[in-house]
């Protein structure tokens, strides 16, 4: 991601910190401060004492990611950090790449730009074929993640719930690996056969990820998990004479290497003997199922199931894979009916650390994935579109995920019931490194809330500060926006129909001062930690419900916690239990923060946060000079949807390869730079690999 991999050697070496027995090199731009040193010490002690569950109760702006990075670096074990959505995952990935520029920080999220699962609607006799668009860049990052886990100890994976969906069996995936060393005895024919078994495609003209080409005694391989590096294998008399990394674009040799491990080009690759065994199992299941439908006199289902399954069996027999191969994953992995599928979690070493960021949201997500998937597949099986074994191609049930959990740290400002019941210890991170304290809370009557809010907004606008307002209904939000606008306030309304990229732009405009007030219904979502916001106004705070529950109120009040003058006004005619608990908790934290500041002579200072897209990635200093040109380019790309951006990436990749074929390497390099920026916008990463481990 970003330019950090390139910048790494220029980092201030004094700020690179290592710990005894740990392979991690932590870039510490500043030492831990506030509650961080104590939180790090307690979490590390908890892990060493063998605690299965711990909770890091970290308030907004207290540097929870930095604490996680310090714990990982001190323990020296591989780690996986779960985030509730792609946007937050990209943000975490960006931050971990900054803290660990010389270690393998990987990104494992769903690789679908668009996904329509196969489904059947019996009422209308309508079958919907599976339709999807796979994002090749994210697929490459997923393959890179599993490779790093199998090869290195200094690995951190940032993942979403995609990690609990089935992928290939790690043991069989490992069996398929091809390790090449200089001096190895192996024939060219055997190398080619192994590559084809790993689902690499031979392509002499269009050399891209997951392909290889043969020229005389030389085989060029473009590994599926690499974005910008290929391997040249030179052979002589059935012996590996030399191995080299080279640039697939320019053909320039980068370095000679003593060995290289080629990993399969898909997580679903399976050894030939396993496929043949699976085919027999599928045939046996098909016979049983057809017999069942015959007894029921359901001849349409008989014909449907037989036709579809026989076609898939033919493809498996000839090619080793078929469309929808994941529906036969139980037979391919040799699992028993009802057994959990292999997932990314199975690739983790037994001593890995797990962090569940925003755990109060994530636990609910992990709980809900199985049921939705099951309901859709049951209909497909019932009407003869799939064999019953397709039900075992599924995400993990929550209790299965729980059994596979390693030592876990829940990270949240407002832990939910599950964390409270399971935490071996709760580590508080309430004091911020900046000395900022939680907002002052004021309760005012709801009857005059709109007029009072207008006068409060005017005070903030005069001081050059921003305001967030949360309402209960869409209609109220629209009416309030209209009222404020008529009274000369620069206001925008943030609603659920706005997509992620546009949402980021709105937040950016608020920070830049294009407008002063943001009205929304749910202000709990990511990316709303804005230092310029000094007032959060909660309308109708006494109406009990999800958005006015204790946890939601604490989260919303915390949106003003990054400003020295942070204030939260709760408009209510009575104080509910949820309000009382939220106010008491905020006051408790505030008292603790103020006592710490007084004891240590700390003056609170506001957060200075550079204004950039939260999924921009990281810029190096040289990029600032080209800011104007980059801004023009970004403006064009920002108007595109995620699907359009994916098409633009494919167009640029083709253009880059065309330039390379015409030996116009300077032009090809320029297009590659453009591609890196575009990928940074879409994925929060430029697609560069983690630094190579020493060979």
Curated annotation (Swiss-Prot):
Record protein name field: UvrABC system protein B
Any GO BP: nucleotide-excision repair
Cysteine pairings via disulfide bonds: none
Pfam families, sorted: Helicase_C, ResIII, UVR, UvrB, UvrB_inter
InterPro entries, alphabetized: Helicase/UvrB_N (IPR006935), Helicase_ATP-bd (IPR014001), Helicase_C-like (IPR001650), P-loop_NTPase (IPR027417), UVR_dom (IPR001943), UVR_dom_sf (IPR036876), UvrB (IPR004807), UvrB_inter (IPR041471)
Organism for this UniProt entry: Cupriavidus pinatubonensis (strain JMP 134 / LMG 1197) (Cupriavidus necator (strain JMP 134))
Entry keyword set: ATP-binding, Cytoplasm, DNA damage, DNA excision, DNA repair, Excision nuclease, Nucleotide-binding, SOS response
Family per similarity comment: Belongs to the UvrB family.
Helicase ATP-binding domain ranges (all copies): 45-434
Localization: Cytoplasm
GO function terms (MF aspect): ATP binding; ATP hydrolysis activity; DNA binding; excinuclease ABC activity
Sites where the protein binds ATP: 58-65
Domain characteristics, as noted in the entry: The beta-hairpin motif is involved in DNA binding.
Motif Beta-hairpin, residue range(s) on this chain: 111-134
